[in-house]
């Protein structure tokens, strides 16, 4: 897989030709696969139950606030259960194994290393719950190559709120005009642009890498 990644990247492009200095990555659906639907389907719940659990867990405001991690994991799971108490046992099991929604990609580590080799500074800005981070950190092998990271659970801020972008820029003294942010969600990209950061909405590795090369 590594040679395929390098084949897609322009290895002759030099960072000295660019105004871009900093590459900022989201994690879920960018550097790792995040697929809650396939994970939830794997339980084989009846459709009515499956859809209700999707609603009160993965599609809920509680799930989003869990990324902020201002409360304990137990608190967030209890809130989900309160929304559908008839499915308490299954909700708790779904949450107990929720790290299974995250899978490594075959390009992330190579991509980050490639950008570092070109002289870019690489950072992480990601909505990530404390419990999930603790249980999936072994899948985030690219972290050892980055220059810095802001995870929502560590700063109690979440995208697309402006504060989390300001936290990243301030902590690492980044010039937004010399920075580009890659995220799969349009609203998160737009929030970055409002802070003066260039943004690319990630749809695939090939598409994002090509847009990044054009920008950089």
Predicted regions and their residues:
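Surface-exposed alpha-helical segments enriched in charged/polar residues
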Residues: 110-113, 117, 170, 190
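Glycine-centered short loops/turns at secondary-structure junctions
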Residues: 117-119, 196
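Generic structural signal for small/hydrophobic residues in well-ordered secondary structure
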Residues: 26-29, 69, 115, 124, ...
């Amino acid at each position: 897989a590594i040679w395929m990644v390098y084949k897609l990247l322009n290895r002759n492009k030099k960072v000295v030709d660019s105004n871009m200095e900093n590459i900022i990555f989201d994690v879920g659906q960018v550097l790792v696969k995040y697929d809650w639907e396939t994970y939830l389907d794997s339980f084989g719940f009846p459709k009515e139950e499956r859809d209700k659990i999707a609603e009160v867990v993965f599609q809920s405001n509680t799930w989003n606030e869990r990324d902020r991690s201002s409360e304990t994991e137990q608190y967030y799971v209890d809130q989900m259960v309160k929304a559908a108490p008839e499915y308490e046992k299954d909700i708790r099991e779904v949450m107990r194994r929720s790290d299974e929604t995250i899978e490594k990609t075959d390009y992330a580590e190579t991509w980050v290393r490639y950008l570092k080799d070109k002289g870019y500074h690489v950072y992480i800005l990601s909505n990530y719950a404390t419990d999930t981070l603790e249980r999936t950190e072994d899948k985030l092998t690219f972290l050892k190559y980055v220059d810095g990271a802001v995870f929502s659970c560590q700063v109690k801020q979440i995208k697309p709120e402006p504060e989390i972008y300001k936290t990243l820029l301030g902590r690492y003294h980044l010039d937004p005009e010399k920075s580009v942010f890659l995220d799969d969600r349009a609203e998160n990209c737009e929030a970055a642009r409002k802070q003066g950061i260039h943004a690319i909405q990630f749809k695939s590795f090939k598409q994002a890498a090509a847009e990044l090369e054009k920008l950089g």
